[in-house]
C-alpha cells in the first residue's frame, strides 16, 4: 500500500481565536471507470486527547475520550473480499503509534487468529481480509466469520466495504468505543 491516505480537518488555535462551530463535511467518492459512487458525512469529533473545550469536558461516558477502540468488522461472503481503512486521528498529540489487534473470529465467536498492527498518530492503515489472513486461516474461520478491531491505546475511526472483481460496495464509517 502507499496509494491511499486520509484527510483531517482541524481548527488551528495556535494563534488564538475561537471556533464558531463544529466542522462538518460531506464527501462523495466516485470511480471514474466503473461509475461506482459512495457518499459519507462526517461531523467533527474530538479524538485522542484529554481536554476541556468551552467549559465542557470532551468525554463520552465520564472517562477521557480516546482511550480504547472496539470495532466489529463484517466480512463479506465469497466472492467478496472485505476492505477496511483505519484512521488514527488526534486533535492534539497522543501516543506515537497505535497497538491495534485484528482478531479473527469464527461464527461461534471463537478466536481463530490475531494480527497486531501499528498505525502512526494522525496516520492510517488500509487492509483487505484476503491479504491479511492466509487462505488456511480464512478456511478455519469459515462462513459467518468476523473481525474485532481492538486497541487499548487510542480511539480509531474507519471505513469498510466489500470488493469483488467487477466492483464494490462501501458501508458507512465506524467509530471506536
What do the predicted segments below correspond to?
Residues 1-177:
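Gly/Pro-rich, tryptophan- and cysteine-flecked surface segments typical
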